[in-house]
């Protein structure tokens, strides 16, 4: 599938007196084409894993201490990616061992400890870290030989580059279009298997969407939990809809999409991550809506149902640009676009008491979903999911992601779990006695 060429606005001509002015063309934002460069490394909180290092060594599974036996985790990876040949998809498994050292799982099932560095300049790991998968329709099995903390299982159509730097591991970056791995279609699931809490896995779309993944966890009693992920055509579908939204309102929704060097869609960034690369993006997108919200609740109260001990909390602005809520020891100034899409800055940085902690997720979710001015929106949360994303402005990235979720699981922004009935939209799967982690690549198995 080919990405959209940069969209162009229609030429406009108008009369000034008796003179026809020259046509004026206005280019609308389009997808970002990646330009991978070896050694172009940008370190962000999203692609950096803090950890120690042991040096260049490999620990075979049979050499691990006997206490590690309970930390083993069998994994199967099912290749559903249409047309993929044997060896075209690679898995990369990495994280920290129980001492905090950076470690990878190699294709032979051993732990590999990459050599560390005291340099602030990232050094690419030269070891072959890839675990090649079979062709479409096959299942690849392996076992993680010991506990793994703060881990990720990457799947990639091609090869990924990893780097060591003073303080830890640098992983591929979705936000850097010049990243060495930028032209590779990849994604990951989060994974922690600890001796105290057992297995935690997660699929999230808070930052971006890339290679389509799903998963299930089987416990020793036979119980199976699933997070099926997105439809196989999700990236194409979402980018098509984002391009249409840009054509409609002029905002850079289409630029959330990245294409490879041939023009095919690769991934979709969340608006929050896109703003981290272009601070002016969406700067006035919410301005009018925010003014209406703060005006509406000048005297008529906004009620936040904390769904916990604080109960219902009443908030008003009193006609100012500050929202004040009963029981909260902080106030809520008018947010910026970055505050709304990220839910962790400005008025949505949780710095207050338990009431503040309960208000922030519900208020930020209401902004993203565009429900604050709807009938019944004076109580948050109270409206059903059918009311989410029905008015503009809203978080269209989140809207289109949810339209492509097979089973409704997976956050598209930080507080996507806020619902009046407590419905769980999380892509997290947990087990204290997991016997198998199964991952699907390219869409769920039929």
Where are these regions (language model features)?
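Extracellular low-complexity, O-glycosylation-prone Ser/Thr/Pro/Gly-rich "stalks"
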Residues: 22-446
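Fungal secretory targeting signals
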Residues: 1-35
């Amino acid at each position: 599938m080919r990405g959209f060429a940069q969209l162009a606005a229609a030429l406009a001509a108008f009369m000034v007196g008796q003179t026809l002015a020259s046509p004026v063309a206005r280019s609308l934002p389009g997808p970002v084409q990646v330009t991978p460069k070896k050694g172009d490394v940008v370190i962000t909180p999203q692609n950096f894993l803090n950890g120690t290092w042991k040096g260049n060594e490999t620990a075979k599974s049979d050499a691990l201490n006997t206490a590690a036996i309970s930390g083993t985790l069998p994994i199967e990876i099912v290749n559903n990616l249409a047309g993929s040949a044997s060896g075209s998809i690679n898995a990369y498994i990495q994280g920290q061992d129980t001492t905090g050292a950076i470690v990878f799982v190699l294709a032979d099932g051993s732990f590999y400890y990459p050599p560390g560095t005291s340099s602030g300049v990232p050094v690419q790991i030269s070891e072959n870290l890839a675990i090649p998968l079979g062709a479409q329709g096959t299942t690849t099995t392996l076992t993680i030989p010991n506990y793994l903390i703060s881990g990720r299982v990457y799947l990639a159509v091609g090869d990924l580059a990893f780097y060591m730097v003073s303080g830890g591991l640098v992983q591929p970056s979705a936000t850097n279009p010049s990243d060495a791995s930028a032209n590779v279609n990849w994604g990951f699931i989060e994974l922690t298997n600890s001796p105290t809490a057992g297995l935690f896995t997660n699929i999230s779309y808070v930052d971006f969407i890339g290679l389509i993944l799903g998963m299930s966890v089987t416990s020793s009693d036979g119980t199976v939990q699933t997070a099926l992920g997105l439809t196989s055509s999700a990236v194409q579908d979402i980018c098509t809809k984002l391009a249409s939204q840009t054509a409609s309102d002029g905002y850079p929704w289409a630029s959330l999409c990245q294409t490879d060097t041939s023009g095919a869609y690769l991934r979709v960034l969340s608006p929050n991550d896109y703003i981290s690369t272009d601070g002016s993006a969406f700067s006035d997108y919410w301005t009018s809506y925010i003014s209406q919200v703060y005006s509406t609740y000048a005297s008529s109260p906004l009620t936040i149902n904390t769904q916990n001990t604080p109960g219902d909390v009443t908030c008003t602005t009193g006609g100012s640009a500050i929202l004040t809520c009963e029981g909260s020891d902080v106030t809520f100034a008018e947010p910026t676009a970055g505050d709304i899409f990220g839910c962790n800055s400005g008025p949505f940085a949780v710095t207050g008491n338990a009431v503040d902690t309960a208000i922030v997720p519900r208020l930020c979710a209401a902004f993203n979903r565009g429900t604050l001015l709807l009938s019944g929106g004076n109580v948050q949360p109270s409206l059903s999911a059918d009311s989410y994303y029905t008015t503009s402005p809203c978080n269209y990235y989140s809207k289109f992601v949810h339209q492509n979720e097979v089973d409704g699981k997976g956050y598209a922004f930080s507080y996507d779990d806020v619902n009046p009935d407590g419905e769980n939209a999380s892509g997290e799967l947990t087990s204290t006695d997991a016997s198998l982690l199964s991952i699907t690549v390219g869409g769920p198995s039929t």
